[in-house]
């Protein structure tokens, strides 16, 4: 799969994990996967892994399934196909989440964009109050168009409050 694509002599997942390990604030970086081949590659490159089941609808369910095993209050989900993720970007996200007075359950960073036809990127639709209403690769459903403030591009990193992630997993399985 895509995570094992060779980039300059190393699989994409290794590049992504090594970039995450450069973060000042992440104590541990784990690759959560159901693939024995990915686990083998990660172990060879000194990257911690957690073996998961195969039957998940999305990456959030996969991360949520292992959240109880991780002794942290905040869990950062970095998609495995982000080999150019900037460690400073991860650090900024962690700082925002830990310093926020209301301690949000989830922070999904995005980039403002004006594209609407590209189905390869995840769109983030925000309400007029700034709350996320919709995340999807699909085009914006017509019924939402009058209620949205902007369409943004999701940047493949999400910060979760661990308790919220565990609750999500319990209610969506």
Model region roles, listed by residue range:
Residues 5, 39, 166:
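Nucleotide phosphate-binding site architecture
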């Amino acid at each position: 799969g895509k995570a094992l694509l060779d980039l300059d002599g190393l699989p994409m997942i290794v590049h992504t994990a090594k970039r995450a390990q450069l973060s000042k604030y992440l104590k541990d970086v784990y690759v959560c996967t159901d693939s024995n081949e990915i686990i083998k590659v990660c172990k060879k490159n000194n990257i911690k892994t957690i073996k998961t089941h195969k039957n998940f609808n999305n990456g959030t369910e996969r991360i949520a399934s292992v959240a109880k095993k991780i002794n942290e209050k905040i869990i950062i989900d970095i998609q495995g196909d982000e080999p150019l993720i900037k460690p400073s970007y991860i650090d900024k996200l962690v700082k925002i989440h830990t310093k926020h007075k209301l301690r949000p359950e989830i922070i999904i960073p995005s980039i403002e964009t004006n594209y609407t036809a590209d189905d390869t990127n995840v769109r983030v639709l925000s309400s007029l109050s700034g709350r996320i209403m919709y995340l999807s690769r699909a085009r914006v459903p017509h019924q939402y168009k009058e209620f949205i403030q902007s369409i943004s591009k999701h940047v493949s990193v999400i910060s979760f409050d661990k308790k919220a992630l565990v609750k999500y997993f319990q209610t969506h399985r």
